[in-house]
Swiss-Prot record:
Pathway: Aromatic compound metabolism; 3-phenylpropanoate degradation. This is 3-(3-hydroxy-phenyl)propionate/3-hydroxycinnamic acid hydroxylase. InterPro entries: 3-HPP/3HCI_hydroxylase (IPR023786), FAD-bd (IPR002938), FAD/NAD-bd_sf (IPR036188), PheA/TfdB_FAD_monoxygenase (IPR050631). Its cofactor is FAD. It comes from Mycolicibacterium vanbaalenii (strain DSM 7251 / JCM 13017 / BCRC 16820 / KCTC 9966 / NRRL B-24157 / PYR-1) (Mycobacterium vanbaalenii).
Length: 569
């Protein structure tokens, strides 16, 4: 079905899939006033956990959408992960001590409860609707938008953009006609979620035992996940047998017959990435864009990164602040990092789960030898191996010959600061939901110049001057448009000292779009307006007027019973 090119969209964005990526994206769009429709083929949210680990970047995103305080009660912060060999000798430990982005790096969590909080957050917006029991059938793109049709007698919907957050078997991806390149492991695992944790300790472990590798993860609220490798001569039917499940649990607990099993299932690991994250007015996020093994707990978090990266860009285009070309930077920025996460997760899985005793023994000797080297031990302990976003292309501006210490393309830190009115607040709460221009102890209006200052102000940017605490209340060049913050922990002074750049242009997703010394701020600001595809006037986007129609949010239907398996490609 094709809509006439001049048809007025019913909504700005259709999000296909009410999983974590789709719900996070809908919250971001909702906060920016974007008329959004979320559709899902199920009749309710999935009620069983898939992901079990939240990282600091995801919590920072939940902070940005105003839901972190509702999420935190369902988490286990600062969760330690230990790796043991077959004799239960410690191979490695991950216990990252810092919280440079404002939150712990490793957190166990109960996904259904966190997803429910994301879903509940949409009740804040009259212009966001969720429709369950809507299976997308097709997308027909025109110059003016996309017409989405559904199975049955559901009415079609016209939108300006469609984002597929519809999982590994994504219908959106098939409609786009893009590949899903990669591999599916031949190794199968039995995952068992249990209530009333029979172990009861707060942390997690991986048993790298070649006889049968296993995982034991404390989630939250007394829930624990066990995972056991299934041998090649064991069928899926055998692994699904309750007696087999109890036998596996008996390897880890003394009374397996007393364990309260919530759910068990057999799954395999996928290492796949879509050929493109964008094609015209259709985009992909979350598992629809990439699948990765569980070993780094980054599948869920990578989907949240997608939403954070894409959300502000979609809102800027729909609201007329940027041209459509800004959306091309989504694929440029997210693809490389998602690929790095897939590769790391795949590699860690190969290290953890060899069943050849000779290879496992060699691995153990190498790791034990490396652990006596302090720098290598810290590298693992502090999770320094985790790939961090560093965008060389996209919605960022780099000098022709950038300094090796340039922070451009990386995430800005989030220490706690003082303002003149509040104490001990997280920096992002001062920076606000949009763009921010940040400097170290300088007159920001004078540094930028009136033209650049006014243009950033017209885009809703906030201006923040960071100072030593001794200067917090000095009124020398106070400006009503500039928020002064005191560096209560010293983290900002240390950060600016290392980077050497003193003026930062920070995107809504907290990536540093550009950085420079004070004297170059006007020219870097001008260059950024070009690479960010920002419009000077802030009128309509490149594809017609913004839709001013709104849709109402509907309540969630009754809970779906357990037993539905996640799809595989």
């Amino acid at each position: 079905m094709t809509a006439p090119s001049g048809s007025t969209p019913d909504v700005d964005v259709v999000v296909v899939g009410a999983g974590p990526s789709g719900l996070t994206l809908a919250n971001i769009l909702g906060l920016q006033g974007v008329a959004t429709l979320v559709v899902d083929e199920r009749d309710t949210l999935i009620d069983y956990p898939r992901g079990v680990g939240l990282d600091d970047e995801s919590l920072r995103t939940f902070q940005a959408i105003g839901l972190v305080e509702r999420v935190l009660p369902h988490t286990v912060p600062n969760q330690i992960l230990r790796f043991f060999d077959a004799d239960r000798r410690l191979l490695a430990e991950m216990a990252p001590p810092d919280a440079r982005f404002g939150w712990p790096k490793r957190n166990g969590f109960v996904q259904p409860l966190v997803d429910a909080e994301l879903f509940g957050g949409l009740e804040r917006f009259d212009h966001v609707e969720v429709r369950f029991d809507h299976r997308m059938q097709s997308c027909s793109e025109t110059a003016g938008g996309v017409t989405v049709t559904f199975d049955g007698d559901r009415d079609p919907v016209r939108a300006r953009y469609v984002v597929g957050c519809d999982g590994g078997r994504s219908t959106t991806r098939r409609q786009m006609g893009v590949s899903f390149d990669g591999t599916t492991s031949s190794t199968r695992w039995l995952v068992v979620d249990v209530a009333n944790d029979p172990l009861g300790h707060p942390n997690s472990e991986v048993g790298a035992d070649p006889a049968r590798p296993y995982v034991s993860i404390s989630i939250a609220h007394g829930i624990r996940r066990f995972e056991f490798m299934i041998h090649p001569d064991e069928t899926d039917e055998q692994a699904d047998d309750p007696a087999f499940v109890r036998r596996m649990l008996g390897q880890r607990v003394p009374y397996p017959e007393r364990v309260d099993i919530i759910r068990h299932r057999v799954y395999t690991h996928h290492s796949r990435i879509a050929g493109s994250f964008r094609k015209g007015r259709l985009m992909l996020a979350g598992d629809a864009a990439h699948l990765m093994p569980v070993w780094q707990g980054q599948g869920y978090n990578s989907g949240i990164r997608d939403a954070a990266n894409l959300g502000w860009k979609l809102a800027a285009v729909v609201n007329g602040q940027a041209d459509d070309a800004l959306l091309d930077t989504y694929d440029l920025e997210r693809r490389k990092h998602a690929r790095a996460m897939i590769d790391l997760s795949t590699m860690v899985g190969k290290v953890i789960s060899p069943t050849n005793r000779g290879l496992a023994a060699l691995r153990d000797r190498v790791i034990h030898a490396a652990s006596v080297v302090p720098t290598l031990k810290r590298y693992i302990l502090e999770m320094r191996f985790k790939p961090m976003p560093r965008y060389q292309q996209g919605a960022v501006y780099h000098d022709a010959q950038p300094s090796p210490t340039s922070p451009t393309g990386t995430l800005f830190i989030q220490p706690r600061v003082d303002t003149r009115e509040e104490f001990n607040v997280l920096l992002d709460d001062v920076l606000g939901p949009g763009f921010a221009v940040v400097c170290w102890s300088n007159n920001l209006r004078a540094v930028l110049g009136d033209e650049a200052f006014d243009r950033w102000k017209g885009l809703g940017a906030r201006f923040v001057e960071a100072r030593p605490m001794t200067q917090l209340h000095w009124p020398g060049y106070d400006d009503a448009d500039v928020e002064v913050v005191g560096d209560r922990t010293g983290a900002l002074k240390k950060w600016f000292d290392v980077s050497t750049d003193s003026v930062l242009f920070v995107r809504p997703d907290r990536c540093i779009a550009g950085a420079c010394i004070a004297q170059r701020a006007p020219e870097v600001s001008t260059a950024l307006f070009a690479v960010l595809h920002l419009t000077r006037e802030g009128g309509a986007g490149s594809h017609g007027e913004k839709s001013d129609g709104t849709v109402l949010h509907v309540a969630q239907s009754a809970a779906e019973p357990s037993g539905t398996s996640a799809g595989t490609p």
